[in-house]
């Protein structure tokens, strides 16, 4: 299982709509392994990154992941990544410099609508 991470900007550190990821880097800011995901603005770490919600799976890994029931941590944090971590699955992480625009909140939707209007 793999995912992406990028720089966590100052205005995102306390934003509960931004999922943060902590990574054990194998090659600094290139390739690593996830060990924590959180949204809380009450928790701050110097080495937290912005989790980009894009995943890759090998077929067998996807079968295993989808067969698992939600874990206690997944339900508590409302983050599906915890299901994999609690099942001792490895989540590989690649660092990316640029992130595509995502629409996770009403504010994000308004932002994208404004971008489209300005381009027309």
Residue ranges and their predicted role:
Residues 1-69:
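Conserved core of the sugar-phosphate nucleotidyltransferase
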Residues 48-120:
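Conserved alpha/beta core of the MobA/IspD/sugar-nucleotide pyrophosphorylase nucleotidyltransferase superfamily
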């Amino acid at each position: 299982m793999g995912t992406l991470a990028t720089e966590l900007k100052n205005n995102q550190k306390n934003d509960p709509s931004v999922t943060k990821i902590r990574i054990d880097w194998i090659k600094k800011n290139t390739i690593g392994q996830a060990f924590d995901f959180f949204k809380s603005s009450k928790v701050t770490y110097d080495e937290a990154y912005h989790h980009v919600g894009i995943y890759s799976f090998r077929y067998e890994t996807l079968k295993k992941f989808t067969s698992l029931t939600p874990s206690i941590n997944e339900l508590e944090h409302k983050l599906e990544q915890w299901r994999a971590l609690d099942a001792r699955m490895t989540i590989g992480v690649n660092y990316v410099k640029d992130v595509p625009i995502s629409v996770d909140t009403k504010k994000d939707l308004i932002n994208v609508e404004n971008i489209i209007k300005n381009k027309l």
